[in-house]
């Protein structure tokens, strides 16, 4: 491995898209043509290599991002296959954080769907260079040009078309390569492994010339010398075009667009060529942001093999044979099995046991890995998703990932005493794997409550609990995960004092509580958080060692709000003053004082109840439009826009999650089964007062 595993030879890429756009099939074909799979796995037969959990094979959707290493030309491609269902958006977010480039797969019939937009925005957030693969060109109703138009309109993406389809629907047989100006035709009888180049068909020559001119107009903008050459009428070489496309893709000036049919094995090899030619290597990315532990300074760290070791844990998975596996992306230095590193987030040392290179769910033991590699480590004790592993002598904390608040929750009760213990273990394992899944205990009923990003998310968690951990449980009805917040700022001066013989307890804190939306000088790293704590103590009014007690107290108690006991979010607490006693003060005393201040502050801050609002997209034939809009309005929905799409209408609305239970049946009866919908969490918003009263009464 080591000789070719130089940084410039590596491509760390994700394949992401909406559910059913053909992402897993595309990945399967890539593995087949790069020689890693000996037979092609079909998703609809439940045999796809990347979909390795039982639940995935049954449902035909990808739930966890399996990481796979393969080779093309002389390059190493690490592929992360990401889920396309909206309940698993967190998986996509985790993968994008550690990737250098991505391939966005679009359904040539449906075009840009809601999850495609979400994934695109997430990729924008992490500045991931990407290209687009318009798939399913063999399907009835496929329209490459309409799909490209949607990519431009809906995603605001500057498209660079580098291929055109030859033939449509069942007559789709190949592509025009606009860089070489050649047609590429696949032989059906060889399962797409054999293809040949020929001249562009006569009826497509004018169109190809037009799109080639557009391609050149866009790429020559990136280089003045080549632009002059182009304007003077000189020929631009294929090599020059490729260099410019690579430059523009890495700088996100445009997004190359390719097409094909992964299922029919057409277009996969040129897609692999484009991944290698146009997507960045770790060297092109160059740096990773982080904090130097010794100075607490934020710095840019070079991605390099010669620097000290640093890596980000981006996924934890339970493997039936190896136990817990931690997937890491190495940003700098190298690591050998048996070495000891430090988890700088938890300040705990970890010994590296087995190190594995993963191929979906086959594994290869390796002894060494270095910058740019994505590997799985077995046997780490304290590392969870988003933690940094670092060289002990030169410690860094890499930029952490932010995870969304869960929107739906349900109670689970073990069926027997034996299940009780197993359930605790199962849920803590599953929560370690997936930060968007949370477990808590209802203080009033003592029930265990699980929370997640949607009904399917929790269904799969419960299913895994039964299958992998053999836990039988009774499941309650899904409930909305309400939240609470404050709407006005207040300052609380609170003293905790206890004297009952022997050492007493004393702590005084002065805390300003304010809604996050009103904070003017909010730091960038705090912008996605739901709770921010800051200490502005000067002159030792509260000694440094007691301040973590204040933060811990606030963090613990904010899980129980003051209106109906829901967690408090979207506020900042600033410790501005306080007092301590040489003998009677302790971390615990300051923790209790912070809790007392919180209770007072939340009452004074004009608290309000919040509910999750979902972005709902309904695709319906024209004739049912009126009924569907009327129904959404009756669910407290707000229509955002209406777009024609082919012979159907697309209605986008913001609707409270509380009003969406059972919507699938209503929609079916309103449209005689012809409309479909998808929904994704959008934001939290205040609950109208009459609805809030009903929620409080239920509590």
UniProtKB/Swiss-Prot annotation:
Where does the tr-type G domain lie? Answer: 8-283
Checking InterPro entries in the record gives:
EF-G-like_DII, EFG_II, EFG_III, EFG_III/V, EFG_IV, EFG_V, EFG_V-like, G_TR_CS
Can you cite an annotated GO cellular component?
cytoplasm
| Primary localization | cytoplasm
CDD domains associated with the record: EF-G, EFG_III, EFG_mtEFG1_IV, EFG_mtEFG_C, EFG_mtEFG_II
Give the Gene3D superfamilies listed for this entry: 3.30.230.10, 3.30.70.240, Elongation Factor G (Translational Gtpase), domain 3 (3.30.70.870), P-loop containing nucleotide triphosphate hydrolases (3.40.50.300), Translation factors (2.40.30.10)
A GO MF term: GTP binding
Query: Could you tell me what this protein does?
Result: Catalyzes the GTP-dependent ribosomal translocation step during translation elongation. During this step, the ribosome changes from the pre-translocational (PRE) to the post-translocational (POST) state as the newly formed A-site-bound peptidyl-tRNA and P-site-bound deacylated tRNA move to the P and E sites, respectively. Catalyzes the coordinated movement of the two tRNA molecules, the mRNA and conformational changes in the ribosome.
Q: Which family does the entry's similarity section mention?
A: Belongs to the TRAFAC class translation factor GTPase superfamily. Classic translation factor GTPase family. EF-G/EF-2 subfamily.
| Name of this protein | Elongation factor G
